[in-house]
Amino acid sequence: MANALIEDLKWRGLIYQQTDEEGIEELLNKEQVTLYCGADPTADSLHIGHLLPFLTLRRFQEHGHRPIVLIGGGTGMIGDPSGKSEERVLQTESQVEANVKGLSNQMHRLFEFGSDKGAKLVNNKDWLGQISLISFLRDYGKHVGVNYMLGKDSIQTRLEHGISYTEFTYTILQAIDFGYLNRELNCKIQVGGSDQWGNITSGIELMRRMYGQTEAYGLTIPLVTKSDGKKFGKSESGAVWLDPEKTSPYEFYQFWINQSDEDVIKFLKYFTFLEKEEINRLEQSKNEAPHLREAQKALAENVTKFIHGEAALKDAIRISKALFSGDLKSLSAKELKEGFKDVPQVTLSTKTTNIVEALIETGIASSKRQAREDVNNGAIYINGERQQSVDYELSSKDLIEDEITIIRRGKKKYFMVNYQS
């Protein structure tokens, strides 16, 4: 019998591979299932490239199943070779511990913890750290054939350039994770990105060999791709992080609202919990009135609210509207710095100067003649307000919180003016 959750995941395009499609559907239909997804603490924050497997795990929770969120405090000391063309640089134990703390805090935004049926947060260092070298080789290594491991894509792709024994053993450690969670918490499904297929199947095979366990399954999520061929999860400024100190909620919101018409419906299915009917309505709106960008607004609002909360979403929308309308004086210096993060930074030696002199000193104008022409032609805006007098004097009233001034030349060329103290 078809399972409603699996049907929804298929409609959203969220299933890439399943170890046993019929077995998974039968299991989900007969009981509340415990399943898990993990992340190694390679940084102290997740970025949006990590989101999809965990959002998929959250969908299982929404349907009454119990998710286990695993932070790899143990495996993070080793490094997963999957999807990597060269050896990872090993982190110190203190780095890994700090990163574990950061990721653990973020998971509380993604899942409901606490109740008997709530999500459970675990750190695989708690059990991997207890295994001795002799036990690893005798109790686990004995059940994993070298030829079997060499057949894994994550290993094969690295053999030409070399792989250390450290990373070679990674798949066994992740296999031990699945076996431990299966025995201790009755965990029967592992969810992961498409690059985790080899690690997931290793866990299932290890359980079969060691315990005769056959009721263990794997499900992978597709790699997120963009229609233009560019890598998903990157903005012009770099990775889009979940940590608001690394990527502000405004920048986060802007990333989503700027998605193309070609990608927006797919991303609504992937990254939001909107119902099928609403997404279909937004698709119709996108097709009939693309200029309204209703689908992009829904995507940005839903994902930003889920990750950062209602208040941060309202601030992001307010900043966006102010920047679009040119009402710059309604924003704080911090908000302006977020909004104009990527514009040229220029410096003035004094907070009081003639507008023409200011344009020359900052390099916005190449000569006094050009500066005068720009001002007279109405091409110069100070904090969103047009200034057409060459006699205008910049003063303290043109400073936002006594820190910065935003000068615009023409329709779109912005400059952030800082002042020498």
Swiss-Prot record:
Keyword Signal attached: no
Q: Which residues form the S4 RNA-binding domain?
A: 353-420
Identify the residues that bind ATP: K234
- Its GO biological process terms? tyrosyl-tRNA aminoacylation
Q: What is its main location?
A: cytoplasm
Cellular localisation: Cytoplasm
For the protein in the UniProt heading, the enzyme class is: ligase
Enzyme Commission number(s) from the entry: 6.1.1.1
Q: Where is this motif: 'KMSKS' region?
A: 231-235
Entry GO CC = cytosol
**What does the UniProt keyword field contain?**
Aminoacyl-tRNA synthetase, ATP-binding, Cytoplasm, Ligase, Nucleotide-binding, Protein biosynthesis, RNA-binding
**Which ranges belong to the motif 'HIGH' region?**
41-50
Tell me, in a sentence or two, what this protein's role is.
Answer: Catalyzes the attachment of tyrosine to tRNA(Tyr) in a two-step reaction: tyrosine is first activated by ATP to form Tyr-AMP and then transferred to the acceptor end of tRNA(Tyr).
For this chain, the family text in UniProt reads:
Belongs to the class-I aminoacyl-tRNA synthetase family. TyrS type 1 subfamily.
Self-association and partners: Homodimer.
Protein name per Swiss-Prot or TrEMBL: Tyrosine--tRNA ligase
Tell me what organism the protein belongs to.
Staphylococcus epidermidis (strain ATCC 35984 / DSM 28319 / BCRC 17069 / CCUG 31568 / BM 3577 / RP62A)
